[in-house]
């Protein structure tokens, strides 16, 4: 297997702010070590009225912060995991 398995994401926090009736979330996280070529996959879901999770947004970034905007009030779950250039994924945080 090529490369080093990406490190687990840790210390995931989300700061929510209101903006004209909509909400935005600034997510921050880190990893125990820096690995070259790692990016982060983000998956934001919301609890639907029927109790199931509905996908709201996905994103990929090389930063350790990401801002989601124009969100309605709701019960959200954010999952973040590191992925290397070969597609290997580290343990997620949510």
Place the predicted regions along the sequence by residue.
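Surface-exposed, short loops/turns at beta-strand junctions within beta-sandwich domains
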Residues: 68-76
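Extracellular low-complexity, O-glycosylation-prone stalks/linkers
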Residues: 23-26, 30-63, 79, 89-94
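Intrinsically disordered, low-complexity segments enriched in polar/charged residues with Gly/Pro
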Residues: 2, 54-56, 69
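Polar/charged alpha-helical tracts
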Residues: 52, 67-69, 85
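Pro/Thr/Ser/Gly-rich low-complexity, intrinsically disordered linker/stalk tracts
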Residues: 1-36, 72-73, 85-94
């Amino acid at each position: 297997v090529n490369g080093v398995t990406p490190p687990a994401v840790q210390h995931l926090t989300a700061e929510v702010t209101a903006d004209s009736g909509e909400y935005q979330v600034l997510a921050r996280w880190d990893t125990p070590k820096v690995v070259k070529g790692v990016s982060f996959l983000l998956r934001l879901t919301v609890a639907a009225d029927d109790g199931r999770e509905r996908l709201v947004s996905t994103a990929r970034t090389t930063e350790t912060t990401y801002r989601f905007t124009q969100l309605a009030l709701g019960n959200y779950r954010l999952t973040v995991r590191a992925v290397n250039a070969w597609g290997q994924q580290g343990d997620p945080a949510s």
